[in-house]
Each structure stands twice: as C-alpha cells, then as structure tokens.
Amino acid sequence: MSLPLLAVKPRTLDQRVVSYEVPAEDDPVIYRLTDATDAAAVDALIWAAYRQIFSEHLILASYRQPFLESQLRNRAISVRDFIRGLGKSEVYREQVAAVNSNYRLVDISFKRFLGRPTYGQQEQIAWSIILATRGLEGFIDALVDSDEYQQNFGADIVPYQRRRRMARPFNLVNPRYSDYWRNKEISLSGRSYYQARYYASGPLDKQIVRGAIPANFLSMARSIVVPTLDTQRHVARATSSLVKVPNTAQERDLPPTPVKPVPVALPYRYLPSQPKV
C-alpha cells in the first residue's frame, strides 16, 4: 500500500499570478492535437513533446518512440497518454531518472510535465515518497493524472513552461544530472583502478589484487608472446637474390683515341720567365 501525498503549502510563483504581459516572441507555443489538421502539424506536435520531456539535447533518432508516434498519428491515444508514455520510456529512465537523486528528479519532472518548479523542499520530499513507494511509472501516472495537469493542459495540449521569465526554458537546463553524479564521475575518472573499486571489507589495495593473480602469470604471458619478424626485409632479400639484372654494356672494337698535347693559356703568362737584372 503506497503512502498518500503529504500536504504542501504552495508558494507565490510566476504561474500563480495573474499576467498582464504583452505577448512577445518568447511566449511558449501551445500545441493542440485538435488544431493539427495535417501531417506536418502532427510532426511539429510530436517534436514539441520530445523537446519538453526528453530535453533538446536528447532528441536523437534512437530515442524516438515509433509505437507511441503511430498511435498518436492514428488518434488512438491522446496527447496526455503520449506524454505519459514518454515519461515511462527507457530513455527517460536511463537519461534522467537514473542519474539524479529523488529530490532533483521530482523537480525536473515537475518542470517538464507540469510546467513549473516545485514549491521548495517540502514538495520535493512529499513527491519523493510517491516516487519511492510507487516507482517511476507510478510517479509519472500521479503527475499526469493530477488535477493541476488536467486544469492546465487537459488531454490534447503538450505541456509547456507557464509564465517563463528566465533566459532559458526549463527543458533546456543543462546538465541533466545532479552535482552528486557529476562529482562522482569526475572522482572516478581521476583515480586509479585500485582507488576506484571498493569491497564491503574496505578499499581494494594492490596486495589484494596481486593475491588474485597466479604467481606464474607473468612468465606464462611472456611464453605465449610470438617473436616478431621483419617480414618486409626478408621478402626483399629473397626477391632481390632471384632477380637477374641484364647486362646493358655494349662491347665494341674501337681504336684507342690518341692523346695530343694542347697548348694551355696559363694565368700570368705575360710575365717574363726570367726576371731581368
């Protein structure tokens, strides 16, 4: 038996205040299935749902849900059921739920499914109890079936951020994982193998690792090493000994060329050979 939702006192957030703002380009686009009259409009609605639930940097071809898309295109399910299916998919479980604590997962899910942040730690604790007792699928069902979701989005509207005044939408907040997970990844990547692994009895040091390795392991590894040969050198030596180079020298009976003295103009020839006294 799951525990009931604890009472939470709401806070004054942007979406709870009456707006007198002038419409601008930053206002969210509302996607309704009833307004989608052609295939292009349905595709735009589907991609808007992916951007809202999976976040912009998670829209990959491998993350798409073709079964849910086919049902939505054929009007077999509503937009609310499509959003429910995206929240229960393995992509949301692995990329969002598995890398965050329960408190941060509640806050992220509220931003993506209800379009608002949580009312502080009190609401995060209350909904984390639902997450712990009902699991991720029960938590998604509780969000989608809540009165707040029905009043703001109904069955045909893709969830969006209500009254956004931030520089970036909720679904684009990066990173998608919490500080604890990021610091854990950094600590594991900067430590050695002996420091990263732990047993229940304590840290795994080098002595325990060496005890698990047989004494003759290194000698056995050296014995199976195949000696390397310079194949190119041996092939070149074998081929060069078999190749016969033809003799291209031409043998002719030519008379010897006579050598005659040739007068040479030596330098400083204008000087007398014997100096005059």
UniProtKB/Swiss-Prot annotation:
UniProt key word Cell division: no
Major site of localization recorded for this protein: membrane
GO terms of biological process kind: photosynthesis
Residue intervals of the PBS-linker domain: 11-189
Keywords: Antenna complex, Membrane, Photosynthesis, Phycobilisome, Thylakoid
A Gene Ontology term for the protein's cellular component: plasma membrane-derived thylakoid membrane
Membrane topology category: Peripheral membrane protein
Subcellular location per the Swiss-Prot or TrEMBL entry: Cellular thylakoid membrane
Family from the record: Belongs to the phycobilisome linker protein family.
Record's subunit section: The phycobilisome is a hemidiscoidal structure that is composed of two distinct substructures: a core complex and a number of rods radiating from the core.
Annotated function: Rod-core linker protein required for attachment of phycocyanin to allophycocyanin in cores of phycobilisomes.
Protein's name according to its UniProt entry: Phycobilisome rod-core linker polypeptide CpcG1
Organism of provenance: Thermosynechococcus vestitus (strain NIES-2133 / IAM M-273 / BP-1)
Gene that this polypeptide is encoded by: cpcG1
